[in-house]
Amino acid sequence: MDYKTKKNSNATVDIKLTFEASDLEKAFDKTYAEKQKNIKIPGFRPGKAPLNMVKRHLGDTVASDAINTLIVDGMASILTKLEHPMVRFPKFEIQDYQPGKNLIATAVYETNPEITLGKYKKIKVKLPEVSVSDSDIFDEIENIRKQLARKQLKEDGQTAASGDIIDMEYTVCEKGQEPKNASNTSNDYHLGHENNLKGFDENLYGLGVGDRKEFSHTFPEDYLQNEVAGKTFEYSVTIKALYVNILPTVDDDLAAEFDGSDSLNTLKDKIRKNLKERFEEGIRNKKLEEIFKEIIDDSKYIFPDSYVKEESEHVFHNMIHEFKLPHITMEKYAKMIKKDLKEVQESFRNLAENRLKHFFTRQKIAEIENVTYTETDFDADLEKLASSYQIPLSDLKEELEKGKLMDQYRENFFAKKVDHTLFDLVEKKYTNKLSIGQVKDYLNQKEEQKV
C-alpha cells in the first residue's frame, strides 16, 4: 500500500491510499475466512463449509466488508508514521472499485489544533494592594459571633423583634385562590435577616407565642422566581416559639471556641492574614482573566470543526444541567427562548471557541515552560482541600471517585498551577491601596477595569 497526504489550512489533512490488486485479494481472503465461521450452506453444518465453497457462495457480496478491512488494516500500519496525527478516523471514499485491479481510497481527516502563541511573558499588569482595616476584622468577628450564637426562649409576655428567632406554622396561597396544602412549619426563622423577603418580617414584629396574624405580601416585579414575581399572596401565621439570639462575648474564650486560638489577638492576626490572602487571590484571578484575554487576542488558533461542535454541545448541556432545565435539544431551546436557531448555535459556538482557546493556551504555556503535574502534586492539593473541608483525605477521595470527578479535579489543579506560573512571568506594578470593600466592588465588576 502507498499513501500520500497533503496538509490543509483548516487543521485537516487530505489522505490518499493506493492498494495493489494483491492487497485487495488478501482482504477478500481475510473476509471470507471470517464469514466461514458462521455461514450456513446447504449440505453443511453452520461454520463447517469449505473455504473455496464459501468464496463461490458469497462472491463479490463481501466487497464492502473486504474494502473496509483493507482500509482499517492499511491505516493501522501507517498511523504512527503520519506527519500530522489523526484525531479521529475519517470516512473514506472509494474512487474506483474494479475486482482484480488497484483500489484508491481518499479521505479528509482532522488533525490536532494549531496554536501560534502570542506574547505571554513580560505582560504589564497593575495590581492594587489589599489593605485590611480594623473595621474589616470587626465584621469578621461579628460573623463568628453569629456562627457561635445560641438561642434562648424569651420570657412570657415578650414579643418578636428584629434579631429574634421564631418557630411558626403558616398557610399561604395566592390572593383569590384556595390554599393547596395544610399548614407548613418553619423553625429557626431569623427575623430581620438580610436574605429574608423585604417587608415580610415587619408583619411579625410585636407578636407573642400563640399569636396568629393574617396578612398579604406582594412580591417585587423583578423577583428572581418568575412564577411569583409581582403576585400577591395571603399568609396566616401562628407563632409557636420565640427565642432571643444570644451572641458570645468578644474575648479570648470566643477565639478558643472558634478555632482553638490561644487569644483574641491571635485570632485577629489570623483573620487579617486570611482576608489579605483571600482577596489577593481574587484580584490575581481577575487579573489572570485580563492576561489571558491579551494573550488570546495576540495568538492564532485553528480548531477542527469537530472540536468546536463537541465543545459547543458540552457547553449547552452544562447550561441545561446548571439551570435544572428539562433535557432538550438546542432546537427546542431556541424555540423556548424565542430566538433563531442559527443565532443560538453561533452563541454557543463562540463560548466553545473561547473555552478551547483558554484550554489550549494553558497547554501550550505548560509545554513551553515545562510545567508538570505529578500524582504527588495531586495528593498534596487534595490534602489541602480535605483540610479546608475538615474531612479525612480518604473520605474526599472516596467521594470524588464515586462521582467520577478525579480527572476533573486533576485538570483543575493543573490549570491552577499553569496560571500561577503565568502570573509569575508577568511584570507586576503595585499601585494604590484598596480597602476590602473597594476590592469587593472591583471583583464584582464585569467589565475590565484598570486599577
Swiss-Prot record:
Domain PPIase FKBP-type, which positions? 163-248
Pfam families given for it?
FKBP_C, Trigger_C, Trigger_N
Record carries keyword Chaperone: yes
Q: Which UniProt keywords apply?
A: Cell cycle, Cell division, Chaperone, Cytoplasm, Isomerase, Rotamase
Instruction: Output the SUPFAM superfamilies linked to this UniProt entry.
Output: FKBP-like, Triger factor/SurA peptide-binding domain-like, Trigger factor ribosome-binding domain
| Entry superkingdom | Bacteria
MF GO annotations: peptidyl-prolyl cis-trans isomerase activity; protein folding chaperone; ribosome binding
Enumerate the Gene Ontology biological process terms. 'de novo' cotranslational protein folding; cell division; chaperone-mediated protein folding; protein transport; protein unfolding
- The UniProt record lists the EC number as 5.2.1.8
Name the enzyme's class.
Answer: isomerase
Family, as annotated: Belongs to the FKBP-type PPIase family. Tig subfamily.
Q: Which NCBIfam families match?
A: tig
Recorded protein name is Trigger factor
Native organism: Leptospira borgpetersenii serovar Hardjo-bovis (strain JB197)
